[in-house]
Amino acid sequence: MKIQGKVFVVTGGASGLGAATARHLIGQGAKVILVDMNQALGEELQRELGENAQFKSLDVTDEQAVQSFFQEVEAEYGQLNGLVNCAGVAPSAKVLGRDGIHELALFQKVLNINVSGTFNMLRFAAQLIAKYEPQVGEEERGVIVNTASVAAYDGQIGQTAYAASKGAVVSMTLPLARELAREKIRVMT
């Protein structure tokens, strides 16, 4: 896919891998909507990146907010060409730690953000991407990138929740790639 002039959403876009991805896409001539919960960092990065960047504070696990967000993207940009899912959390917690056992609520929070949030974003992104035919000279409508981790295969002590979440992201990406290939949408980790 040629990046120049394309519209991308980058979750976790205010810092880390998401911010680096946004910088790279902007450098290639894309328009990028940064999605993050950290408003201060998101707005700062938007100013740094200039007119081709927009920031939106969004909880990727909120179904209604995400649906509304993609409606706004379509209204403003008329299309979507890509989604890069970088939003995630990676707290360290041992199952049998000094302060007690691993909290179930923390485990569920990690899975909710890293897995459910990724799925929530990609399903609405796929719906929008599939509405539009590939641009002239291109074979695919768009691309969805889900951030995985070596922790999916080789998790370390204290990474139980994070490793489980990344294993789930890896596991859902292949069937999604097979399904969405029919819609000319590439999905990968």
Where does each model-flagged region fall?
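A short, exposed helix-loop element centered on a Lys and neighboring polar residues
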Residues: L122-R123, L174
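Alpha-helical segment proximal to the catalytic Tyr-Lys
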Residues: Q127, R178-E179
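Canonical Rossmann dinucleotide-binding motif of NAD(H)/NADP(H)-dependent dehydrogenases/reductases
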Residues: K2-I33
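Residue(s) in the substrate-gating loop at a strand-loop-helix junction
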Residues: S149
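Conserved mid-core segment of classical short-chain dehydrogenase/reductases
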Residues: A90-Q108, Q127, K131-E139, G158-A161
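The beta1-alpha1 cofactor-binding region of Rossmann-like NAD(H)/NADP(H)-dependent oxidoreductases
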Residues: Q39-A40, S57-F69, L104
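Catalytic Tyr-X3-Lys loop
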Residues: N81, V89, G100-N120, V145, ...
